[in-house]
Amino acid sequence: MAVSVFDLFKIGIGPSSSHTVGPMRAALMFAQGLERDGLLAATASVKVDLYGSLGATGKGHGTDRGVMLGLMGDAPDTVDPDTIAQRLEAVKASRKLALLGTHDVPFVQKDHISFYRQALAEHPNGLKLRAFDAQGETLRESTYLSVGGGFVVTAGAPNTKVLSAVEQLPHSFRSGNELLALCHSTGKSIAQLMWENERVWHTEEETRTGLLKIWNVMQSCVARGCGINNPDADGTLPGPFQVKRRAPQLYRALSGNPELALRDPLSMVDWINLYAIAVNEENAAGGRVVTAPTNGAAGIIPAVLHYYTRFMPGSNEQGVIDFLLTAAAIGILYKLNASISGAEVGCQGEVGVACSMAAGALAAVMGGTPAQVENAAEIGMEHNLGLTCDPVGGMVQIPCIERNAMGSVKAVNAARMALRGDGTHYVSLDSVIKTMMQTGADMKTKYKETSRGGLAVNIVEC
């Protein structure tokens, strides 16, 4: 499987890539399949079953909303977040849902979407969609797996996405060691290798434009989260806990006191925290975000990239592009050899992976060698090993928002530590990726995005 930078960084909506974006894409694929095969007009009803982690935390993660939007023909990267609540309320009031926006079927959420804690054999995040005719006969039944980061595969089918391109990649790699060997043999940086690989799928202009669009969405997300031209940011987050959004107040405090940087050399940490919190509060509110590589960890790469552009002398547009390409190369290693799904390996696969990606990318744009970049990425994951995914109330809020801030600061520290060395280190990135996957396999299910362990059972829902 060959993976593009645009597979790792996808524009979508919150609060979850695996539980909102993935199911939305699956439902859209299902509805489009009905239309493609001439079954849409004969469809009299649809039924959706959510399994495993989707069933356990799907309500808090917006899985039901994502599925409904997908059935209605919406895609994560184009749906208008500001219209979602109104449109779903219209479905509730009319008790009808328009498949692909054109074909009405009866739809009552509690009757047509079912939640099951029992997981499917293939993956903890499974969903089954069925379409029936007027006589109740099954027209189509499809089972999908949301495997993390918005990636969706059909259960029982090989993942054939871009397999034909593997041998065509000018710089094919599956491990950190192979990546370093390519850098050594070609004399190119990791970003340069990724840039040349992207030409298999995109022109150079398409790649540059696409990456800058990703960066633009990240910047817009931070701005909205800070309350810039977004009065809603001063309120509370959805859900029973009424968590107060903190980013706007923090933004006003920091921007209103610029001389603080002269008195407190660590004031930049406050800004890094702000950037991460702003993104993840927007994510928790269902706003527009970039999976990086997941929604639950969407604040780390934007926060560290904002740190680079704001605080690093000589930062420029090319540096932003190199940052994203380097981060994607590291993310690909986790995607190919481990997991980026909290339901499969815990939060080490989300915040841990994002921290590793950001650390390596920052080291690269700070002038690090490929060996130092690999070292930074390894440090970023090594000290997230064993991190559990225990969202309180099934919401992507506590501890997720603060955890992104902590992961962002940790990524900056990992990059700086690596740059103080020569790239020689005992634990390789490949070893830590393997260890992360093994640790995730050993982790009890209650600590893997089921809200049945950890903080999720020790915080009383009020």
Can you annotate each of these PLM segments?
Residues 2-13, 29-30, 45:
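N-terminal signal-anchor module of multipass membrane proteins
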Residues 9-27, 284-304, 347-355:
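Conserved phosphate/anionic-ligand binding catalytic regions in large, soluble enzymes, centered on
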Residues 18-35, 302-314, 359-367:
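Alpha-helical support elements that line or immediately flank enzyme active sites
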Residues 45-58, 90-98, 324-337, 378-391, ...:
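Short, mixed-charge aromatic SLiMs
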Residues 76-260:
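C-terminal regulatory domains involved in ligand/effector binding and gene-expression control
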Residues 202-346, 454-462:
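Accessory "access/gating" subregions that flank catalytic or transport cores
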Residues 315, 326, 332-405, 417-426:
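Hydrophobic alpha-helical bundle architecture
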Residues 426-462:
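Extended hydrophobic packing segments that form well-structured cores
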